[in-house]
């Protein structure tokens, strides 16, 4: 990591509260938000982007992660089929306590910002086609926080039912990204899964720059046993992590092509 990126991470870390490294308390199924895993062409450029967003570089033994309150961003170099747009996971969204100050930093760095007349909401395009929704929320207790991950299936009720059954999520309708429009969601501790109907079948997230989303699970072997019995597709069985001796992982995929890593022991 070059000196400039390191200095941005140090500054961001000084603004974060120590407690924000903890993941949310899991739901009754033992599930909470965990991580978002990106495959990118330029790791340094991606690290810089997330540092400017307010992330803090941390490590779980050999596993380097960019920490935000309640979630981690993992970045790995790799070839991809494209960015997030056109994938089942179109984008994810962050809330910012002081949005004008945050946007001023983004403009200095030259990042592309899209807004439709609402000064409190918009999208920023990161390296490798990572689309990030943003909005201001002055009531936040931290400078920045994950708000939602936005999925676009053809069958919204079926997706809600699947995430309720497999991950113990709670169906809801919420205004996402500062909008007044109520859309279908699934509440998971630490993140909202926003679900909007797509008229066409979108690509799987696998192989895209946002390759998969991650959930931290309490008692992962029991979770996988239960999920498989309920019809979930286990694409990689339980295995120890190659990066941390205290962590184990598995992969599942929903019926719409959303690739998910389920972990136990993710946080440093």
Question: Which positions does each model-derived feature cover?
Answer:
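Positively charged n-region of N-terminal signal peptides that target proteins for export
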Residues: 1-5
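Bacterial N-terminal signal peptides
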Residues: 6-18
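Short, low-complexity disordered segments enriched in Ser/Pro/Gly and basic
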Residues: 26-31, 82-87, 139-145, 204-208
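Short hydrophobic/aromatic beta-strand micro-patches
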Residues: 39, 93-95, 150-152, 214-216
């Amino acid at each position: 990591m070059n000196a400039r990126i390191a200095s941005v991470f140090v500054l961001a870390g000084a603004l974060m509260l120590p407690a924000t490294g903890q993941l949310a308390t899991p739901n009754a199924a033992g599930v909470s938000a965990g991580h978002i895993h990106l495959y990118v062409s330029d790791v340094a450029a991606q690290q810089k982007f997330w540092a400017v967003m307010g992330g803090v570089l941390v490590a779980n033994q050999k596993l380097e992660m960019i920490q935000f309150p309640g979630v981690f961003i993992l970045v790995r170099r790799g070839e991809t089929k494209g960015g997030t747009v056109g994938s089942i996971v179109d984008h994810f969204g962050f809330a910012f306590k002081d949005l004008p100050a945050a946007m001023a930093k983004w403009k200095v760095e030259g990042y592309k910002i899209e807004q439709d007349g609402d000064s409190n909401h918009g999208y920023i395009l990161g390296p490798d086609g990572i689309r990030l929704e943003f909005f201001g929320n002055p009531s936040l207790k931290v400078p920045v926080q994950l708000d939602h991950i936005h999925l676009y299936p053809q069958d919204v009720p079926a997706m809600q039912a699947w995430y309720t059954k497999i991950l113990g999520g709670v169906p809801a309708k919420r205004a996402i990204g500062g909008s007044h429009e109520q859309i279908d969601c699934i509440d998971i501790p630490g993140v909202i899964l926003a679900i909007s109907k797509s008229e066409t079948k979108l690509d799987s997230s696998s192989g895209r720059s946002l390759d998969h989303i991650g959930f931290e699970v309490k008692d992962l072997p029991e979770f996988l046993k239960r999920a498989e019995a309920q019809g979930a597709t286990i694409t990689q069985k339980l295995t120890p992590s190659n990066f941390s001796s205290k962590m184990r992982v598995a992969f599942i995929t929903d019926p719409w092509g959303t690739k998910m890593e389920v972990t136990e022991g993710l946080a440093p």
